[in-house]
Amino acid sequence: MKKTLLLLLFTLTTLAGHADEGMWMLTDLKEQNAATMYDMGLDISIDKVYCPDSISLKDAVVHFGGGCTGEIISAEGLVLTNHHCGYSYIQQHSSVEHDYLTDGFWAMSRKEELPCKGLTVTFIDKILDVTPYVKKQLAKDEDPEGLNYLSPSYLSKVAKRFAEQEKIEITPFTALELKPFYGANRYYLFVKTIYKDVRMVGAPPSSIGKFGADTDNWMWPRHCGDFSMFRIYATPDGKPADYNESNVPLKVKKHLTINLGGIKEGDFTFVMGFPGRNWRYMISDEVEERMQTTNFMRKTIRTVRLNNLLEEMLKSDKVRIQYASKYASSANYWKNAIGMNEGLVHLKVLDTKKKQQEKLLAYGREMGTDAYQKAFDAIREIVSKRHDAVYHQQAIYEVCKLGTEFYKIPSTDKVLQALKEGYKVFHATNCLLYT
């Protein structure tokens, strides 16, 4: 399952069955969650979970590759992550002669650990709530289209300004990521350190790591050994560096240990990592749009693509290995789209959303304000107007970007510019595809 870096997940639960489910920013734990966590059994200081200025659990939970969570489990940079997260790198080193996808791989010494081209491990150094600063920048900067508040390119410039003002140390391996949250009502700056010399240490055979395959994916309970191991390397003085034979295993600030005493009913537990995003604040029209555009396209187009890929992969071990990661990646959200639509219908989510909306609108009327109704109507109007654009953009993404492996597809900014210049949606997206 794919995870993208948008926020940190913090799910609280006890094994007795009660769960305080949700997503919380680590920066908000002390204010919003500390009392509840202590009541549920947390026996360490909140500052040991997250503290921007000292060592905490944030230094042992990493962003693995492009969108996964990893855990540091040794003092010398050993990273544990999911099998599906390491899958493309297992494939990277596989061949017909050395089929690590099928047979698994274990390095018996440091010299046998395999460098993974393109793989990074990212540490979050600190998370800063920069909402007041960003809003001041938005107020003073020119924004003729009114899109700066969500524009990645604009927010990247603001992040650099803030870093210069606050004298945040920047190296070639530092990354600044400024992200809007809660509908751009709050902005967080992630200051990150990226390690680029990461080597594969071990992975089980796919018969274990992918047991159940697409049938079990996104389903619970699971019965697969979904894990793989990698190691972070750095310069002898512990600095991030590109791959070099002289690099050594990173001496990490903190690593996680396993309590060999096991667990018992009622123990306090939490999950910390990079889960991506959720859409719980969507109105019913947006949920319906998701079902009819994104999910519909994923299911329809990827079914054809996956069938064609599988047919060729079954003919040749070489082709099977070459396309294993692309097949798995495509199948991942193909299954997600199918299951999501089925779940939304089965659980009558649209009906629930409509009841929630009416309750909120009724509250607004009781309070003597039409602000809620105006906001709701505005969102509905936008969703209605953009339907064709979203439909065609998703079709282009699935067919041209994924289906034929084109390197670029038109950005939303380019699509909007083309529409401003008078193109019809269909012609705009098709013309921009080749710019």
Where are these regions (language model features)?
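Sec-dependent N-terminal signal peptides
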Residues: T4-T13
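Sec/Tat signal peptide C-region and signal peptidase I cleavage site
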Residues: L15-A19
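A conserved glycine-rich beta-strand in the N-terminal activation segment of trypsin-fold
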Residues: D59-E76, H255
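Catalytic-histidine neighborhood of serine endopeptidases
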Residues: L80-I124
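Short, Lys/Arg- and Gly-enriched loop/turn segments at beta-strand edges
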Residues: Y89-Q92, G276-E286
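Long, charge-dense accessory insertions within large macromolecular proteins
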Residues: E145-I232, G238
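Charged, amphipathic alpha-helical linkers/stalks
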Residues: R290-F376
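Conserved small/polar residues in nucleotide/adenosyl-binding loops
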Residues: Y434-T435
